[in-house]
Amino acid sequence: MFKKYSIFIAALTAFLLVAGCSSNQSSTDSEKKVTLTISAAASAQDALEEIQKNYEKDHQHITIQDNYGSSGALQKQISQGAGADLFFSAAEDKFKKLVDDGDIAKKDSTELVGNEIVLVVPKNGDSPVTSFSNLAESEKIALGTPESVPAGAYGKESLTKLSLWDKVKDKIVYGKDVRQVLSYVETGNVDAGVVYKTDALVSKKVNIVDEAKADTHSPIVYPLGIVKDTKHRKEAKEFYEYLQSDEAMKVFEKYGFTAE
């Protein structure tokens, strides 16, 4: 009887040890280090970096890797299979292309924030430009390439609506993204540039001299979505939801974005 009891106790102990190890293993697995890649419009960089720092502080097993660039270039990268878990675009048409092609499910997307287009000049320069009305007096103007840079496309729309495009198109120096356009203005290589308000606000080297009225260009909306081929759907979904939270939205608004 005692022998049977001893065998039972030994078996129970072994079972509990195995169960305990499994439980610990499960706990460890659930906290495995995960790196999320977000392909994001260059204009969102400052806000995103602060938001990500806050998120990583509370989710220490998550590392967020950024891939910044023009929305058009990022869209092409994702279409060609470049690894990304989320896409944060500054252009609805580039984002819609991925949805239409099945790279992002509509149910996994949202219109997150909005922005504005402004005219900037070098802070310590002697630019003749004081508003859109006398932009034609400038020698060089920086603008994002309209075909791939959303800010450039919106800027061209505004310049066309204001009957300025034909007067200034031969003076334009094109940038690969909005940050390059801003850099041209900051260094005084151009007299003025057309950028997002959010970019102008984070620069200490430019002055905003005018804002493009909303009726001069298409609505500026930044869509966010989870890439269908993500290998970390659970973690991508959690960060996707966090970006829509009140906490994250306060940071976006701090950098000049508007809530949608």
Curated annotation (Swiss-Prot):
Entry annotated with the keyword Transmembrane = no
**Membrane topology for this entry?**
Lipid-anchor
Which cell locations does it reside in? Cell membrane
Family matches, as CDD domains: PBP2_YvgL_like
What Gene Ontology molecular-function terms does this entry list?
A: metal ion binding; molybdate ion binding
S-diacylglycerol cysteine: lipidated where?
A: 21
Q: What is its main location?
A: membrane
Q: What is this protein called in UniProt?
A: Putative ABC transporter substrate-binding lipoprotein YvgL
Organism for this UniProt entry: Bacillus subtilis (strain 168)
